A protein has these predicted regions:
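Active-site-proximal beta-strand/loop segments in catalytic clefts of secreted hydrolases
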Residues: 25-27, 57, 128-132, 143-146, ...
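Metallocarboxypeptidase
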Residues: 215-382
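Soluble non-cytosolic domains of exported or imported proteins
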Residues: 25-29, 55-59, 103-107, 168-175, ...
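Sec-dependent N-terminal signal peptides
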Residues: 3-13
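RNA-recognition motif
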Residues: 41-50
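Short glycine-/aliphatic-rich beta-strand segments at the starts of folded cytosolic domains
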Residues: 17-26
């Protein structure tokens, strides 16, 4: 199948107080554990084993690193400004970008879903309301198929985007793919075969509240809210980050397995919540998945040019055979042309996660679930 890549030319890292991008020339396990103990989000780390790690960090947390004796070099002192300047250049190009530095705002996401449904009713279903987010915003799904409003006996696949609010590349990629499918239906052999023989479901915006918060931070893009927007962090001294639950640590499979793969700290970027599925957003995904028969799911994130598969909650643990061979075979096919690094979290980004969506989908429902992390290290989140 043709691999559709959506390259938006984006950027590298974060915002809160001020976000910086720093490099630490020490990759030892001791340093990694010290960073985790200080609440550093290591989800997206550029690294060269044995030489350095490079990542985004709030300025106030960087101060804690200094106090702890961890030496680092500042690569970008103000990432929000860095992002905004690059996104401004992108948004001036002659392309159907959104108004948020080239990305769609929350309202534009909904508008484009409505547009797809109304303009291509022969292959795009009516919007399906799945439920409301913590702050009461609707979360929608849409199906692309040759009989979109009929439940046919065809294989289903699910694509999700924006579990993390600072990763809008995830839903932009899905919209690009949806538009490619509908615009080429009837003229392109592969697009036509897919829509004639599959039921392709899309939930492009799992975390609408976080996205709206980022719009408020910077309407031109670059906001670094990651989590949803539940009030969790009672600290007002700017020692940590924002309120919210990390939705991709809130699923039930191996939830709270340890404090490295997720955090019990309500102010942490990887805060897992008080219980599994405590959040309406993850409950919505759970209910939707359990009402369908998905053999495969792709939960889109950014960044890293990676394709990650379970299991992720403990280092070195692989799915049993024959599942491992299936994960590897599908993964190799999906990365044949884009050259993404494929494997488990440890094999790709070098960290563990627990309470994560793909682990839950595979561990509980035997779904071959993958996390495409799209965009290069230089692209970053925005």
């Amino acid at each position: 199948m043709k691999k559709i890549t959506f390259i938006l030319l984006l950027i590298a890292s974060v915002f809160a107080g001020n976000y910086q991008e720093i490099r630490i020339n020490d990759t030892s396990k001791e340093v990694i554990h010290r960073l985790q103990d200080l609440g550093v989000d290591l989800d997206h780390v550029q690294q060269k084993k044995g030489e350095f790690i490079q990542f985004a960090i709030p300025e106030n947390i960087a101060s804690l690193l200094s106090e702890d004796g961890i030496e680092f070099i500042v690569i970008h002192d103000d990432l929000e400004s860095f992002y905004a300047s690059r996104l401004y250049n992108i948004s001036s190009r002659n392309f159907d970008y959104g108004s948020m530095g080239g990305y769609y705002t929350h309202d534009e996401v909904v508008e484009h879903l409505v547009e797809l449904s109304e303009d291509y009713p022969n292959v795009v279903s009516e919007l399906q309301f799945l439920g409301e987010s913590y702050e009461g915003r609707p979360i929608y799904a849409v199906k692309l198929s040759d009989n979109p409003n009929i439940d046919e006996d065809e294989p289903e696949v699910l694509y999700t985007g924006l579990h993390h609010a600072r990763e809008p590349m995830s839903y932009m990629n899905l919209f690009y793919y949806m538009y490619w499918l509908v615009e080429n239906y009837g003229s392109d052999t592969e697009a036509t075969a897919l829509l004639n023989n599959r039921e392709m479901w899309f939930i492009p915006m799992v975390n609408p509240d976080g996205l709206v918060y980022n719009e408020g931070i910077n309407s031109n893009g670059g906001g670094m809210q990651r989590k949803n927007h539940r009030e969790t962090c009672s600290s007002n001294d700017d020692q940590y980050d924002w309120d919210g639950i990390d939705l991709n640590r809130n699923y039930s499979y191996q939830w709270a397995f340890d404090n490295d793969g997720s955090s019990p700290d309500p102010c942490s970027q990887t805060y897992r919540g008080t219980t599994p599925f405590s959040e309406p957003e993850t409950q919505i995904v759970k209910n939707f998945v359990e009402s369908h028969d998905f053999p495969i799911v792709l939960n889109y994130h950014s960044y890293g040019n990676l394709l990650i598969h379970p299991l992720g909650y403990i280092a070195g643990l692989l799915p049993p055979e024959p599942d491992l061979s299936v994960f590897r075979e599908f993964g190799n096919e999906m990365t044949e042309y884009n050259n993404y690094l494929m494997g488990t979290g440890i094999e790709t980004v070098g960290y563990t996660v627990n309470g994560e969506a793909c682990d839950w989908m595979y561990g509980v429902h035997d779904i071959y679930a993958y996390t495409p992390e799209i965009g290069t290290w230089d692209d970053g989140f925005w």
